[in-house]
């Protein structure tokens, strides 16, 4: 027979002893709580990269990219401050083919206009590098980087440095020989990496916008089919951006200014004249514009198919994300057609390039929603 216990009996001895706090738990919690601060810093970088892409486009459209003929990452931060400094820079520019074959007779004032565009473009690159360095090393020293994110954030700095080197590699292609502009394939490399960096930052911002545990739970209900569709859209959009850079690099947008045909035919004229034949895909204005058109049509068709598939999703936010993808793809096609019909003036051209930025971001957002759906209640409120 068991021994009776008083209802007033002390029970403290029967309770389990409290476990000691594990070292580092508070530190890990603080680092997890820093996701918001890191996210704000990434938003700053995102905005700067968007501006950088726009300034880079305007630098190209104003034919300013070859106005600075030296690569001085540190000393170049200080612009010419005296008449002697300006005379030296102008003399360097007058020694390259662009001046001798295209801009001979340019005044100092005209040179200063294009110089400031290129200097501003490079200076903005320095600002982006500084913002990255201050943020990354500041978070690193104060141990505010969320677990698992040090390598990802460091990668952004590495890619930024690589982008600067590619930028000079691009400029160097137009300083010798008979080149009047930078090599179009180098321009495509430079712009392509800029969009890759932008997309990476955008993805990081979205991931840090939700707690890690929420992401792990949401991934269980992810929609693999829509993720695959978004991957196809990302790939096609990347190809289209590179083709757009080739179009811009050789002014192919002004070669054929009719639509839907090209000089009255489906195919451009004399499209295989260059030797070896592969050069036509990069240097023949007609073929480059034709390829840009065809991939644009394909991107829209695939986008509409993926949008149609997204109608079956049980998640409202996922469907809305793909709605916006369909809208921007259609809008970009219309904007591209208007740009061609107007012989690619700088206003329409820069708007079309900005549309590409929005397109990439909306496709990434749709992919994120498909991979990490947001659950909603029956009333439509986010759960």
Curated annotation (Swiss-Prot):
<keyword id="KW-0472">Membrane</keyword>
<keyword id="KW-1133">Transmembrane helix</keyword>
<feature type="transmembrane region" description="Helical">
    <location>
        <begin position="187"/>
        <end position="207"/>
    </location>
</feature>
<feature type="transmembrane region" description="Helical">
    <location>
        <begin position="230"/>
        <end position="250"/>
    </location>
</feature>
<feature type="binding site" description="axial binding residue">
    <location>
        <position position="292"/>
    </location>
    <ligand>
        <name>heme</name>
    </ligand>
</feature>
<dbReference type="GO" id="GO:0005886">
    <property type="term" value="C:plasma membrane"/>
</dbReference>
<keyword id="KW-1003">Cell membrane</keyword>
<feature type="transmembrane region" description="Helical">
    <location>
        <begin position="153"/>
        <end position="173"/>
    </location>
</feature>
<comment type="pathway">
    <text>Porphyrin-containing compound metabolism; heme A biosynthesis; heme A from heme O: step 1/1.</text>
</comment>
<keyword id="KW-0812">Transmembrane</keyword>
<dbReference type="GO" id="GO:0046872">
    <property type="term" value="F:metal ion binding"/>
</dbReference>
<dbReference type="Pfam" id="PF02628">
    <property type="entry name" value="COX15-CtaA"/>
</dbReference>
<dbReference type="GO" id="GO:0006784">
    <property type="term" value="P:heme A biosynthetic process"/>
</dbReference>
<keyword id="KW-0408">Iron</keyword>
<keyword id="KW-0560">Oxidoreductase</keyword>
<comment type="similarity">
    <text>Belongs to the COX15/CtaA family. Type 2 subfamily.</text>
</comment>
<keyword id="KW-0479">Metal-binding</keyword>
<feature type="transmembrane region" description="Helical">
    <location>
        <begin position="321"/>
        <end position="341"/>
    </location>
</feature>
<feature type="transmembrane region" description="Helical">
    <location>
        <begin position="38"/>
        <end position="58"/>
    </location>
</feature>
<comment type="subunit">
    <text>Interacts with CtaB.</text>
</comment>
<dbReference type="InterPro" id="IPR003780">
    <property type="entry name" value="COX15/CtaA_fam"/>
</dbReference>
<dbReference type="InterPro" id="IPR054616">
    <property type="entry name" value="HemA_synt_rhodobact"/>
</dbReference>
<feature type="transmembrane region" description="Helical">
    <location>
        <begin position="127"/>
        <end position="147"/>
    </location>
</feature>
<dbReference type="GO" id="GO:0016653">
    <property type="term" value="F:oxidoreductase activity, acting on NAD(P)H, heme protein as acceptor"/>
</dbReference>
<keyword id="KW-0350">Heme biosynthesis</keyword>
<feature type="transmembrane region" description="Helical">
    <location>
        <begin position="287"/>
        <end position="307"/>
    </location>
</feature>
<comment type="function">
    <text>Catalyzes the conversion of heme O to heme A by two successive hydroxylations of the methyl group at C8. The first hydroxylation forms heme I, the second hydroxylation results in an unstable dihydroxymethyl group, which spontaneously dehydrates, resulting in the formyl group of heme A.</text>
</comment>
<feature type="transmembrane region" description="Helical">
    <location>
        <begin position="344"/>
        <end position="364"/>
    </location>
</feature>
<feature type="binding site" description="axial binding residue">
    <location>
        <position position="352"/>
    </location>
    <ligand>
        <name>heme</name>
    </ligand>
</feature>
<protein>
    <recommendedName>
        <fullName>Heme A synthase</fullName>
        <ecNumber>1.17.99.9</ecNumber>
    </recommendedName>
</protein>
<dbReference type="InterPro" id="IPR023754">
    <property type="entry name" value="HemeA_Synthase_type2"/>
</dbReference>
């Amino acid at each position: 027979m068991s021994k009776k216990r008083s209802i007033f009996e002390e029970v403290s001895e029967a309770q389990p002893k409290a476990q000691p706090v594990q070292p580092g738990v508070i530190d890990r919690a603080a680092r997890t709580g820093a996701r918001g601060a890191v996210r704000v810093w990434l938003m700053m970088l995102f905005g700067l990269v968007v501006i950088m892409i726009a300034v880079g486009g305007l630098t190209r459209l104003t034919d300013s990219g070859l106005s600075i003929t030296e690569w001085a990452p540190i000393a170049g931060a200080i612009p010419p401050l005296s008449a002697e400094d300006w005379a030296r820079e102008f003399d360097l520019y007058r020694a390259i083919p662009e001046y001798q074959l295209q801009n001979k007779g340019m005044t100092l004032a005209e040179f200063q206009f294009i110089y400031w565009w290129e200097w501003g473009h490079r200076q903005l690159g320095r600002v982006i590098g500084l913002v990255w360095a201050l943020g990354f090393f500041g978070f690193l020293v104060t141990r505010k980087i969320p677990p698992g994110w040090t390598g990802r954030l460091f990668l952004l700095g590495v890619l930024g440095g690589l982008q600067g080197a590619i930028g000079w590699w691009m400029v160097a292609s137009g300083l010798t020989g008979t080149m009047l502009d930078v090599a179009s394939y180098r321009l495509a490399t430079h712009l392509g990496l800029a969009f890759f960096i932008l997309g990476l930052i955008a993805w990081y911002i979205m991931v840090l916008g939700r707690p890690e545990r929420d992401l792990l739970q949401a991934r269980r209900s992810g929609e693999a089919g829509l993720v695959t569709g978004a991957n196809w859209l990302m790939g096609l959009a990347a190809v289209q951006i590179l083709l757009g850079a080739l179009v811009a690099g050789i002014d192919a947008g002004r070669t054929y200014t009719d639509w839907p045909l090209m000089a009255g035919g489906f195919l451009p004229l004399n499209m295989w004249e260059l030797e070896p034949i592969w050069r036509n895909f990069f240097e023949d204005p007609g073929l480059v514009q034709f390829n840009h058109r065809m991939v644009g049509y394909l991107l829209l068709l695939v986008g509409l198919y993926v949008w149609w598939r997204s109608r079956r999703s049980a998640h409202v936010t996922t469907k809305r994300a793909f709605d916006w993808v369909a809208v921007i793809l259609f809008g970009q096609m219309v904007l591209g057609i208007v740009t061609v019909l107007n012989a690619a003036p700088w206003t329409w051209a820069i708007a079309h390039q900005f549309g590409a930025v929005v397109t990439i971001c909306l496709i990434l957002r749709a992919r994120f929603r498909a991979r990490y759906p947001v659950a909603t209640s029956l009333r439509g409120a986010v759960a």
